[in-house]
Regions:
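Conserved ABC ATPase signature
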Residues: 29, 290-293, 311-373, 383-395
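Electropositive, glycine-dotted interaction segments
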Residues: 97-300, 304-305
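C-terminal lobe/lid and adjacent interdomain/linker elements of RecA-like ASCE P-loop ATPase modules
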Residues: 353, 396-517
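Conserved P-loop NTP-binding catalytic core
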Residues: 39-110, 116-122
């Protein structure tokens, strides 16, 4: 869970210091930096598992073939900022698995990761430059300091007591010493002063030290790495949601919606385990006859799995029915011949329709409902403009679903309340008016003077007054919020057409008056 993010000189994010809660709605007009905030989160996530240049490529302008790594740096005219800095405070899970399948347990779960990057020219003028690490640090935040860092409402005993775990005396898990060519990044062992740190020259590091962590050398760093890897941008594609899955497919819902059927099938299996078939039991017995007890055990397992599947599918169908009228049942069809799993939804007429025949909106709702039910889905989930493709009357329902996906900070963290966070952005008045007021972060551009004395524009993040965010953030002006409360301007405000607008109709005006009255 990302609780605070500081960014400077990344695109138009300059001196940004943003506190985050379990659910955050970033509101603002186009072009002010809402997407850049998501890009910063995606960039940090990519850096946890890829090289510096691969991570940069993941967030550069996808529409431009000539996009340059330097475009990530804040620019004023022809001048680029020299360095990009990030600082992320996060609560991480207790345990994680490394690339070799080894389990690691964090010695403490409230951490701060800092990273400073510079642009480095190459000797070959035909090649673009590279990114270089100036500083990389990972430190812990103590239990005593937690109330000063976790500003959103939460239960100190139930939620914070379960989310924050462990202790540590030594300050650093990763530290940086020296300057220039002598700069060294040290990976400290979880034993603190008792273990010797592993030192690496920062001069030519192709990736962050955190991205190379494993369970044996640095379990806490590995857990932080896995947490950052889980930060994702959810971009559900109807074509991906409609595809059936092979039996061998991943059972984790991807950011584009792939493996929806396989994920739902996993949730329906008892204890997450695949049902053993009679044929499988025979092969394990190396041709020996199956005993009556084995058959009874297998029948019992099959019955439990069937009951669990019915319960899970019913829960998700009921959730979906709150959002869409024509959904009464869901199931996964298992095609043994083609070895495919296909999602089906039954309508009020009793007809089952495969995923390929479902509407985009239904599939999107279904994916979010599955995500809500999946305890394995943790970390940060970013979603742009959740209102897109949704009927206006359904917007409150999808907003409630997104809020329910996020962790409940009044209850202990556990399988039924995973450490999960949702951040959405929007410029829709319908969304702005219906989210909790303390979840709103308003973005606008503001003129400022950079370090060299040049006039520039940067993203400025504001909040609504009398919310927990007001402790650390400036209040948004009422004039900036007015368009989101009255999305249609008065008739005489600007002459756009001589035709009568819908809002100008007398019956519409009466309807508006009845709501406002």
């Amino acid at each position: 869970m990302l609780t605070r993010l500081k960014v400077s000189n990344f695109k138009n994010l300059v001196d940004v210091d943003l506190y985050l809660g379990p659910f955050t709605c970033v509101v603002g007009p186009n072009g002010v930096g809402k997407s850049n905030l998501f890009d910063a989160i995606r960039f940090l996530s990519a850096l946890a598992n890829h090289t510096l240049m691969e991570a940069a490529a993941a967030v550069r302008d996808q529409d431009s073939r000539t996009a340059h790594v330097r475009d990530l740096f804040h620019r004023v005219g022809d001048h680029y900022a020299e360095r990009i800095t990030f600082e992320a405070e996060m609560i991480v899970p207790r345990r994680a698995i490394d690339d070799l399948g080894q389990e690691a347990e964090a010695s403490i779960t409230f951490l701060r990761y800092s990273l400073e990057l510079a642009y480095r020219e190459t000797a070959d003028s035909l090649m673009q430059g590279n990114l270089a690490i100036v500083k990389e640090e990972l430190v812990h935040i103590t239990h005593g300091a937690a109330p000063r860092h976790l500003l959103f409402p939460h239960s100190a005993g139930d939620w914070r007591g379960s989310a924050m775990y462990g202790k540590r005396r030594a300050p650093y898990f990763i530290s940086t010493t020296g300057e220039g060519e002598n700069r060294v990044i040290r990976l400290h062992q979880d034993g603190g002063s008792r273990g010797q740190p592993l030192s690496r020259s920062a001069a030519n590091l192709p990736r962050t030290v955190l991205s190379n962590a494993n369970a044996a050398e640095s379990p806490t760093v590995l857990v932080a790495r896995r947490e950052m890897e889980s930060w994702q941008m959810l971009q559900l594609e109807p074509s991906a949601l409609r595809k059936p899955d092979e039996f061998s497919a991943s059972t984790r819902l991807e950011a584009d919606g792939r493996h929806l059927a396989a994920t739902l099938y996993r949730l329906g299996r008892h204890d997450g385990q695949q049902v053993r078939t009679v044929e499988g039991s025979e092969s394990e017995s190396q041709g020996q006859a199956i005993t009556s007890q084995q058959l009874r055990d297998l029948a019992s397992q099959l019955e439990l799995t069937t009951q669990n599947a019915a319960r899970v599918y019913s829960q998700i169908a009921n959730r979906l029915a709150e959002l869409i009228d024509d959904v009464h049942e869901i199931k996964i069809d298992r095609d043994e011949k083609r070895e495919l799993l296909t999602l089906h939804v039954k309508n009020e007429e009793g007809t089952f329709h495969p995923a390929r025949a479902l509407s985009d909106g239904t599939l999107r709702f279904l994916a979010l409902a599955v995500l809500e039910s999946d305890p394995q889905m943790q970390g940060v989930i970013c979603l742009e403009e959740p209102e897109n493709g949704i009927h206006p009357a359904r917007i409150p329902a999808i907003l409630q679903l997104l809020r329910d996906i996020a962790v409940d900070t009044q209850e202990p963290v556990g399988e039924d309340n995973p450490l999960r966070q949702v951040i959405v952005n929007t410029h829709s008045p319908s969304v702005f008016q219906q989210v909790p007021d303390d979840s709103v972060v308003f973005v606008k551009t503001r003129e400022a003077i950079d370090e060299e004395g040049r006039l520039c524009k940067k993203a400025h993040f504001l909040c609504l007054s009398d919310t927990w965010r007001a402790k650390v953030s400036e209040d948004a002006a009422r004039g900036d919020l007015l368009p989101y409360l009255n999305p249609v301007l008065p008739k005489n405000y600007i002459e756009v057409s001589k035709q009568k607008r819908v809002v100008d109709r007398e019956d519409m005006q009466q309807l508006l008056l009845s709501f406002s009255g």
